[in-house]
């Protein structure tokens, strides 16, 4: 009797493991589908929507090297490119998780005798016939779920450099100013100014927030006279890091440029 009880307990444990793994895999598959849909939407925006002007890797400058005047569109394209990079990383991790849990499922004792490449778990409770006075709980493995293990989906490879979301831009640079010497140009999109930024989530930027970020930049400039401030920005398809040293010069202010919130 003890052996029978032990076998039943082991069977129940195996069934629980299968149920847990099946639930995890279902959730991961839904996540993978959501990522694929979002990626498709972003790629459509960059390839055939408003973003096709610049596309996935297009330059934000014209043939003569001048920045494009379409600043609002540039911001949206930058956001799309940044989000695609995040999706790529998330997608790779989800695929690793799916592979891990599928392997764990296939190693479970109850599943070793199953040769199908798809699986499903359905809980059913059946009552014995009139010739049997005992009730039994039966676990049936029948109609398979559409989780294929024979072929693994390939990760989506999109080469996009990860950068922060720009929150201010350079609208004017005075010749001979500290900003000019720091190689700042009109149209530069700044995503880090000293301790402000970088930001990688849209909830961290926006109309009101960007105005607050601009005020923080003004404070940093006032408190950094003759001290280097690290700035990171995007110009066309290039990511540039430079040092700006606020100081007194022949013009107005300490940096000689006009910075506006996006």
From Swiss-Prot:
GO cellular component, one term: nucleus
Feature: compositional bias, Low complexity: 113-134
Cystine pairings recorded for this chain: none
Database matches in InterPro entries: Nas2_N, PDZ_sf, PSMD9
UniProt-listed GO biological process terms: proteasome regulatory particle assembly
Keywords in alphabetical order: Chaperone
Stretch list, region Disordered: 106-142
Superkingdom of this protein's organism: Eukaryota
PANTHER family: 26S PROTEASOME NON-ATPASE REGULATORY SUBUNIT 9
Described purpose of this protein according to its UniProt entry: Acts as a chaperone during the assembly of the 26S proteasome, specifically of the base subcomplex of the 19S regulatory complex (RC).
Family: Belongs to the proteasome subunit p27 family.
Name by which UniProt lists this protein: Probable 26S proteasome non-ATPase regulatory subunit 9
Annotated organism of origin: Dictyostelium discoideum
Lineage, broadest ranks: Eukaryota, Amoebozoa, Evosea, Eumycetozoa, Dictyostelia
Record gene name: psmD9
